[in-house]
Amino acid sequence: MAMQMNSVVHVSTSPSPSPATSPPPEGKQEHGEVAAVHVVGVGDDEAVMVVKDEEAFGGGGVDYSGRAQWLRAAVLGANDGLVSVASLMIGVGAVSESGRAMLVSGVAGLVAGACSMAIGEFVSVYAQYDIEVAAARRRRRQRRRRCDGDGEEEGSGRLPSPFKAAAASALAFTVGALLPLLAGGFVRPWAPRVAAVCAATSAALAGFGALGAALGGASPARSAARVLLGGWAAMAACYGVLRLFANLY
């Protein structure tokens, strides 16, 4: 993991002779540019600025924060589809040996889950969209009051797209849900069918966990084991509860 180093620079706020002759903030420069400077406090005589530079100080590495939101949504959607449909098929298989019943239950889980994920993501991201639009309008009004209408307006940042988020979430859920359906939905004997669903789900869970960790800069082995154990627990719980329900009723 790249090491992040911060340095605090005290810069006088008194007028300088000219912008061209004013020295840059003290700190390491790379390719003629100073590291990112963020003002964290302003006093009467000086401003305190925090200089954050991950690459100029030799840290290097890749910044994963920009893709964190979409990566999280994709991994969660695929895992939800995989575990939900696999657990549903195994639970139905616990009370019925019919291959058709398992297949129909899996397809129903795929459709219902994809719609639920898409609607939930749409509502969540649209709420975030409304909040960011309202905050941007407040900033523009405050800026116009400070500058008496003479200052330049802030450009609008990149706002989240509710439709793209909903489509991505539904697609990720569908991809995950198709794996147990294709693995065991068309196998006729009961025992091989359940074994195929469990094997395909286990392999996919480990793969999704390792892939998400690798793209996010974490440990693939630890993430794969964590996701795999969680999937096994969900499938075992679904099988046990439905088996108990079938024996009681």
UniProtKB/Swiss-Prot annotation:
Predominant location category: membrane
Topology in the lipid bilayer: Multi-pass membrane protein
Residues passing through the membrane, by range: 75-95, 103-123, 167-187, 194-214, 227-247
GO molecular function term, any single one: iron ion transmembrane transporter activity
GO cellular component terms, semicolon-separated: membrane; vacuolar membrane
Topological region Vacuolar: 96-102, 188-193, 248-249
The protein's name in its UniProt record: Vacuolar iron transporter homolog 3
